[in-house]
Amino acid sequence: MNKLFSLILALFLVNSAVVSSLDSCSICVDFVGNSLNDLLNIILNSGVIGTCGDLCSAVPGGQIVDTVCDLLCDYVGVDEFIKLISDVDPDPIYICEKISVCKTNDNAAASLDLVQINPQNGTVGGTFTLSIAYTVTNTIATGQLAFNIIDPTGNAFGDAVLLVQQSPEQYTQQFQFQATPSEQESFPNGLYTVQALVCEGSCGSPHPNTYTLANGTTTFTISGADSSSMSGAGSFSGSSQSTQTGAASGSGSGFALF
């Protein structure tokens, strides 16, 4: 949450009355994504919540988080805010679109130019770099660039970055992960499939204004796994880093399509 605090504080200190739509959308998605579980627990355990202040004052994180929560909640009203947070499939991007902080574009368009992983033949414990290049041909209002990696047993892990007001041009993104076995992902020997997606809205979300604009795949292999540790299921829990070029807004978050 420190990154979120710093961004919000800087914006308020520079000019509390002027926050660009791009910054506002990113702040909203970060806040909802980071605070969603806390908000759900407060809603479920607090009984009747009469005001935004009642709800937001209980969210951990201090005065800045309280203020952001109040601003978003007051905009739509406490009842509608609670309804959005309590959705059966809560989605930070969709919630921020419904609050009218993030924009949508049903005509967004993009193509994938490159999906490449290095090394293509690696070992357990090694570091892998996934490079993705894509071209936006009609502005992505609020969306994601996401990837999923499926291991030889069918388990999947992935990541995604937020895209806000990406105008037509080419963009590149790199993700890194370390193939360190854990209870969640054992990194067995064999062939792995990489899926990359560019989306308007959250990739894989069932909500309106969500579209897969482009997708592509590649493969790589891992060897050197201890056969005694080749069981396990769940999502990736190793280290992950991402870098991005182009006029894009991005933030990392856990992601899985399946």
UniProtKB/Swiss-Prot annotation:
GO terms for biological process: actin filament polymerization; adenylate cyclase-activating G protein-coupled cAMP receptor signaling pathway; cell motility; glucose 6-phosphate metabolic process; glucose homeostasis; hypotonic response; intracellular glucose homeostasis; maintenance of cell number. Disruption phenotype: Cells form a fewer number of larger aggregates. Disulfide bonds join C25-C102, C28-C96, C56-C69. It is found in: Secreted. Coiled coil: none annotated. Glycans are attached at N121, N215. Its main location: secreted. Residues 249-258 have a biased composition (Gly residues). Residues 233-258 are annotated as: Disordered. Residues 1-21 form the signal peptide. Keywords: Disulfide bond, Glycoprotein, Secreted, Signal. One of its GO terms (cellular component) is cytoplasmic vesicle. InterPro entries: SaposinB_dom. Component of the counting factor (CF) complex, which includes cf60, cf50, cf45-1 and ctnA. Belongs to the countin family. This is Countin-1. It comes from Dictyostelium discoideum.
